[in-house]
């Protein structure tokens, strides 16, 4: 079985081998056939290429021959035309000759004419022969050559002209293209010019808007400058008021007044804080409005300028805040100084010995320097109402020196006010007129104050008079230095003088008036005078109101509480030194005379307007004088 299978397989393999060999031979034969066909096709292609090259050569030759023939035809045409032209010329010449000959024949006779006619009949044949002969002649050949040369030259010129014409056409096309380009560029330039005109119009509009906004900004800047000046003047007034508070702090010796003054200072600080907050809110509103305007603008320079203005305003705000902080610190210092002065007053009250009993006879009361000071101020403010109001008190020789001293001090203070020291105007309301009973009762305290000031030390008064003597001839700086030296010498003997001198040096020029009064009213003389008894005696013509059992009164000057200035003389059972208190502008409610009498029956009021009508701030020149009465 295996052998038979193997044989079958071998037979199959052999059969397949034979088939493969046969197929290979067939494929080989086909390959040879294709190669032969390819060779034939290559040969045909080469032959066709050769034929094409031959055809091209032949076509070029034919074209050259055609061109040559065309040229030859043109030459022949020109020759024919020239020959025809010559023939016409010859015919014309022959006709002219015939006419001439006819004339001669007419002269010769008819026989000759017949012969000539016969000759004319034979002329056409002879003409043709002559033409042939002429063409064959040397002249005709020369003319033909010349004509041919002319034809060649004319053809060359024609070619040159054709070339030039083509060049000119090409140049004309280029020129037309350039013209079209120039037209296009011109159109583009016109469009650009129109666009630039539109841009210029827009720029003009924007510049007009910018100029208007710049003018508005200038107006705002001027307003802000005015506000800044007002703020600076307000700060200067606040500084002057603080200096007033410093000067007044030297005379605060009661226990109840420091608390009130601190409350007033706190109220003023609260008002200042409110004003600063309102200004800050207004400033923020303005800044927001300016920012809203600037959001729609593209001008960075204006933004930069506005930012610089904002920085300046912020600097001003910082300065105001610093001044506010300095005012708070000064108020605190005033509080500390008030406490120290209160302690010293308590110590001095404990150390003061009991006063001796008053003597039965009383000298005539000396003049009141404060009243004279007030009368001088009233004379300057109301000169018309000064003639009907006079004082009825006598003036001894000792009192004249004190009045001269006070008068000179008042004149100096008024000179300083006139020279430009601006004081803050005090808001004074209409004050009620003083009643005769209250005036009579208050003049008893004034008489006591006159007695106190009349018995001052002569040495201090003479020294102050010497210092005030050359006032008109000396300069302001020399007077200030002399007063400070006098205050330093006068206050060096008392323990309380050190504080006064230290604070008086820190005050501005207005403090020079208070330094003069301090030099005349030092601590020792006041203690020596207040140790003496000073009962009160009413002036002639006064009411029955008296102060009994009052050994040492306390005189206080209170500011106008919506009713003007008031001066109170408060009698106390305890022995104490006199105190003069100049209180700043208070915010308390006004008290009537009945309410004041209910609170303290021994309290008398003397209004500052007893010898003059009510003060009204009608002009800016009177503000300094009313403030000087506060000092």
Swiss-Prot record:
Segments forming a coiled coil: 7-353
Record's compositionally biased regions (Pro residues): 352-369
GO cellular component labels: axon; axonal growth cone; cell leading edge; filopodium; growth cone; lamellipodium; microtubule; microtubule associated complex
Annotated keywords: Acetylation, Cell projection, Coiled coil, Cytoplasm, Cytoskeleton, Developmental protein, Phosphoprotein
Function: Involved in the generation of internal asymmetric signals required for neuronal polarization and neurite outgrowth. Mediates netrin-1-induced F-actin-substrate coupling or 'clutch engagement' within the axon growth cone through activation of CDC42, RAC1 and PAK1-dependent signaling pathway, thereby converting the F-actin retrograde flow into traction forces, concomitantly with filopodium extension and axon outgrowth. Plays a role in cytoskeletal organization by regulating the subcellular localization of phosphoinositide 3-kinase (PI3K) activity at the axonal growth cone.
Subunit structure: Interacts with L1CAM; this interaction occurs at axonal growth cones. Interacts with actin filament retrograde flow; this interaction is enhanced in a netrin-1- and PAK1-dependent manner and promotes F-actin-substrate coupling and concomitant formation of traction forces at axonal growth cones. Interacts with RUFY3. Interacts with PFN2. Interacts (via N-terminus) with KIF20B; this interaction is direct and promotes the association of SHTN1 to microtubules in primary neurons. Associates with microtubule.
Protein's UniProt name: Shootin-1
Organism (species): Mus musculus
